[in-house]
UniProtKB/Swiss-Prot annotation:
Annotated localization: Mitochondrion
Source taxonomy: Eukaryota, Fungi, Dikarya, Ascomycota, Saccharomycotina
Signal peptide: none
EC number(s) given by UniProt: 1.-.-.-
Gene (name only): FMP46
InterPro entries tied to this protein: Fmp46, Thioredoxin-like_sf
Stored Pfam families: DUF1687
Record carries keyword Oxidoreductase: yes
Organism encoding this protein: Eremothecium gossypii (strain ATCC 10895 / CBS 109.51 / FGSC 9923 / NRRL Y-1056)
Gene Ontology cellular component terms for the protein in this record: mitochondrion
Similarity remark: Belongs to the FMP46 family.
Disulfide pattern: none
Protein's UniProt name: Putative redox protein FMP46, mitochondrial
Positions annotated as active site in the UniProt record: 93
Function: Putative mitochondrial redox protein which could be involved in the reduction of small toxic molecules.
Length: 133
């Protein structure tokens, strides 16, 4: 099987960034993803703050949603990629005022879609089924 064929068979990845998967917006997002993402989607839950590269990409997709969840977004986008905030546990980022408690963000990396609640999942992804990791 060729590499291209192998890649075509891989599910699309949707990442949910949340301090706790079963609390607040994250719970709502995961519930919506169960019914709204396609069968070729794989949902990953990350309890770590995005890397600088991920944060830049996410803010290019929907800066308003990212800024609502990441209060110091403009400041963080100016920091070097090795700054301690990047890839730190979200629990620590909440204590440091970098991440809002009870919140969450979901990102469909391939389709360039991003939201902060269950409603955005339904509006942007429609409905079908998927797998959650």
């Amino acid at each position: 099987m060729s590499l291209l064929r192998t890649l075509q068979m891989q599910p699309r990845v949707i990442t949910v960034f949340a301090e706790h998967a079963n609390v607040g917006a994250a719970s709502e997002i995961l519930g919506a993803l169960k019914t709204a993402s396609g069968p070729k989607c794989k949902v990953q839950v990350s309890t770590m703050f995005p890397t600088l590269e991920q944060l830049i990409y996410m803010s290019e997709i929907n800066r308003t949603a990212v800024a609502a969840q990441v209060p110091r977004l403009s400041e963080l986008l100016q920091k070097p990629s090795f700054s301690e905030e990047f890839s730190s546990p979200l629990a620590q980022c909440t204590q440091d005022g970098v991440w809002r408690s009870q919140g969450g963000l979901w990102v469909d990396w391939e389709k360039r879609l991003l939201g902060a609640d269950g409603q955005s999942v339904h509006e942007l992804l429609g409905s079908s089924t998927m797998t959650i990791d």
